[in-house]
Amino acid sequence: TTRHREAEGSSYYRHYYMGLIRADGQPKRALSKFAQYTPELGICQWFHFEDPRLDDGVAWLKRLGVKHLRTGLSWADSHREHADAWFDRQMKALENFDVTLTFCFTPESCGKRPHHTSPPHCPEQFAEFCARMVQRYA
């Protein structure tokens, strides 16, 4: 079980570095095996809000030969101060990858329950967030 560092969007922490890099930055044994399957095999890599490891993560992805990347932008994070600046930085760092972008995590204030997995009170608000992100980064 993973303890959450933050109430919203905390699953980012469980996905960091694809399970291929230790928290201290050292490669795990699986890293060399994974590299045998790139670029055909893509990877899911999440970066949490203002993740200080973004640049290192992108460098590892490039070093591994990753071309196809699934990542996400958090609706919950969009309610934070400087969210667009973070999203811009993240998407700029990932621009050389074939990105499949997902939208996730309900802000506590917008959910039927105060939880990042809660359905939104107003689905149209989530749709507006998705549309804004697609217009900004497509």
Protein language model regions, located:
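Substrate-binding cleft and catalytic face of glycoside hydrolase catalytic domains
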Residues: 58-138
